Amino acid sequence: MIILVALEDELTKEDLNGLQIEHMGVGKINAAIKTTEVIRNHSPELIINYGTAGSLNKDISGLVEATNFYQRDMDASPLGIKVGETPFEDSFKIHFGRDGLSCGTGDSFVTNTPELITDLVDMEAYAIAKICKMNDIDFRCFKYISDQADDNASQDWKENVARGKELFIEKIKEIYG
């Protein structure tokens, strides 16, 4: 098991002694590079992504698990393809067979409602999920809701970025011992 996190502010390598935590940086490209590197160098059976996310649903808060992943900034609409769908691919949703929330990943910090509506918005999960799916590696994604993806999102994120750490540590210990 390897845990991928964008920023040290979210989780440090020392926070879960004995578990491998890798920092990947922000965005889909950085996530794809680090995920590929981790798979190539360690051949994990499970990759877990932890980080912060904005919620598009005011009723969603705290630590949540996402299991359905979309690329919210894929826009080939001039070709007659819906936003979020990658041209010439069979499926635009990545799912890992567990109940959970939907997460729209894109290379932008969301401060208003995006065209593709999902429960959560982040900047890395779709890339990790897609690479795990392509390599038959199990994937779990836990996000701490740091903001409501609105006009206050950037300030809320700054205030809340480190708050989910203890909840995530408890969840990992509960699930994996």
Where are the regions that the model predicts?
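Extreme N-terminal starter segment of soluble prokaryotic enzymes
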Residues: 1-2
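Glycine-rich phosphate- or other oxyanion-binding loops that anchor nucleotides, phosphorylated ligands
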Residues: 9-177
